[in-house]
Amino acid sequence: MQYRLDKYGNELSVLGFGCMRFKKKLGRIELADAERQVMCAFNNGVNYFDTAFIYPGSESAIGEIFEKNNIRDKVYIATKLPPQLMRTTEILDKLLGEQLKRLRTDHIDFFLFHMMADIKVWERLKTIGIEKWIEDKRASGTIRQFGFSYHGKSDMFCKIIDAYDWDMCLIQYNYMDEHTQAGRKGLNHAHEKGIPVMIMEPLRGGKLVNNLPQEAKDIFAKHSVSHTPAQWAFRWLYNQPEVTVVLSGMNSDEMVADNIKTACETQIGELTADDEAMLKKVAGAINSKMKVGCTGCEYCMPCPKNINISGTFSAYNRYSADGSFAGFKEYVKCTGKYAPASACIGCGKCETHCPQAIEIRKELEAAAKVLETPAYKAVYKVKSVFKKK
């Protein structure tokens, strides 16, 4: 495993384990699978694990795994808490206490303000005494380092970076988002200030790997160097010295093994100009077929009308990339236990939680127009009858 330094000289594995996407059964994390994958990663040098207060069951799962295997003091835990919940420092203390209890630890290595969307959020936190709170937690050793996660444009990101002496930050960044979100501009700005940058969504929620349009597959196949789409995405990130840790939401043994291999092999500055040009072409091919830039994080769920929002958008993108029949099949599958997109009542609850700022109501309406054909409606009607029995 390769390592890069944080602000204080600690060695962090370039591959971090994102703990949001553990496999679940009936809404509960499959703990045996999660433990096997976490320990495989740990035994191969991964020492950075990312979770959050709002990831159902995640903090408790890794807390149990680390305690059972006696590795808490050999890893770094990064967890997050939404600023919306931070009304007073007393409430914040209570929530932090719950996180420590779940994680079965007396300290958190990296504490992030989750989805800090605007400088106004930080200004509000200052009015409740957040800077003094940070100083107190740092002095007591309860929290070692502070940062924030961000989804949004680069200009606002730079304002937040400049507003405080942060220890680190977490941004969405990949070869499709090089000039969107915080982007390369934000990455470079943080790096110039000596602030380590952790990366989320390296595969854009799987969009850089799964159901690629044929044009993108052909570009990869014709390139002089052969790697899988996932390996190319990680190599593009590891190639950049400004990147400290790349998170991957791993939930299969194969994914863990492949990501470890790539993290061990890739060197800074390894990609050639031809490699970079090839990935730009791939990004263009994917973008030309993508109807909705959903990463499948499911922060928008649950929907009051039981619509599978991310599943609908995946089917909509599949329709655009691979044709109506492929989109139809995926849509039938994703609405098996859910209501169709046309059931949307336009409440807008989902849009307040979407980190990608997607106009979900508008896109659901557009998806319904092309996916809910007479054939689909007939199939859904039959399935609904059987569901009632």
What is each stretch, according to the model?
Residues 60-79, 131-140, 192:
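Alpha-helix-loop-beta-strand connector modules within alpha/beta enzyme cores
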Residues 13-17, 49-51, 75-79, 108-113, ...:
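Hydrophobic faces of well-ordered beta-strands that scaffold small-molecule active sites
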Residues 81-83, 371:
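Acidic, glycine-rich active-site loops and adjacent beta-strand->loop/helix elements
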Residues 58-62, 153-158, 256:
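Short, well-ordered alpha-helical microsegments
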Residues 1-75:
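N-terminal binding-site loop/beta-alpha segment at the start of enzyme catalytic domains
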Residues 53, 57, 117, 151-152, ...:
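Short beta->alpha linker loops
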